[in-house]
Amino acid sequence: MSKPATTLDGLQDGSVELQKRLSAKRDAEGELKHEEDRKLRKEGKTQTPVTNQEGDVLNPYIPRFMSSAPWYAKAGDDDPSASSLDHLKKDKTDSKKEEWYARGQDRSSLERPKKFRKGACENCGAMTHKKKDCMERPRKVGAKYKADNLQADDVISNPHMSWDSKRDRWNGYDAEDFKRVIDEHNMTEELQKKLHGDAPAETDAEKAAAVEEAIRKSTRTLRLREDTAVYLKDLNSETVYNPGSRTFRTADEGYIDKDGMFVRHTTGEGKEMEELTRIAEAESALGNQIHLHANPTAAAIAAKRIKEEAEKAKDAEKRALEEKYGKQDHVRVRPKEYTSVVTAKKPTVIRAKNAQGIAVSKYEEDVFPGNHTSVWGSYYDKETAKWGYACCHCLIKNGYCVGEKGKKKKGAMDTV
């Protein structure tokens, strides 16, 4: 095996240290040439114009720290004394669409080797990979021992990419791939036209009109100004309107707290815990050292003691009232006969003048004017869509009742 070439005090060729030393040497040589050119310009003698790789003449008055490229940006075959601004320009060798990785390229069209080469894959005979990385079917007798049907080398692309192109998420994207999606959509539209006939396509104006119609329909579902709110329909004092669920709740179901929210009554252990919390808060407000969370046992004992004291005070008050007025068993209830005045001949209840009963309706009930035996509104005529009396089918509210004659006359008119 041949040893790597060494230069400059035994440094290997291609090492970073060697490149740095060569760059320093080139800079020194370039500096000497730059001094010679400067002396020639002072003496008024002509000098050879400096050109770049593209043949453009460079400005000789460009500072050296700008025109000289760093050692890591210089190519091996460049003139070390040449000054150029190419290293400051945008890299034109960046990978483009045609310089991308080979996709789906078949090796069958490439030239195959005729004999096994040293260092090639022992399975297929390609030089670009080893046996452990081979993607071909494992052969019973490898290509190393039987040079039959050797495979060509893999197509390895090495596109030159800059720092930005390596981190570009769309780098390598081929817009032609989206054409397949467009073709699928076009095929679907053609099939729909065949199924639904050759109907004209909907224009943009028609689509906009359809959207406006949908918006107009949705606006009709809005609440009218004449609508009455739910909490105004039932003004019963025994019910409470819950704004959260928009329903009415009775006092048996819960109550409204200080924040205006509906709180449902608890049962079982939850009710006991709520009562215990209420007692603990009340005692804490009075200055007693009762804390439900810090010492729940002491709080429970104190709550039990407070309940017993309240029951004892209630029993003492009840006994005092019984001693003063007697027990409930000895209290005589006022007879029902004394609640109203009844005459012997015609038993009618005489009430006070200011007594008002529960009004069922604002209209007068059981009033039969005009010799009618039924009330107004007991009959409905479907043909004329009017209300009337059921006794004579009269549709005039102030009309006089004619009995069965009115029904017969109405029936004869319907038959005609």
Swiss-Prot record:
GO-annotated molecular function: pre-mRNA 3'-splice site binding; zinc ion binding
Subcellular location: Nucleus
Purpose of the protein: Involved in pre-mRNA splicing.
Zinc finger (CCHC-type): 119-136
Keyword Zinc-finger: yes
Keyword Nucleus recorded: yes
One Pfam family, short name: Slu7
Listed Basic and acidic residues bias regions: 18-45, 86-113
Subunit and partners: Associated with the spliceosome.
Organism of origin: Yarrowia lipolytica (strain CLIB 122 / E 150)
GO cellular component: spliceosomal complex
InterPro entries in alphabetical order: Slu7_dom, Splicing_factor_SLU7
Keywords attached to this entry: Metal-binding, mRNA processing, mRNA splicing, Nucleus, Spliceosome, Zinc, Zinc-finger
Name of the protein this chain belongs to: Pre-mRNA-splicing factor SLU7
Annotated signal sequence range: none
Region listing for Disordered, in residue ranges: 1-114
GO BP of this protein: mRNA splicing, via spliceosome; RNA splicing
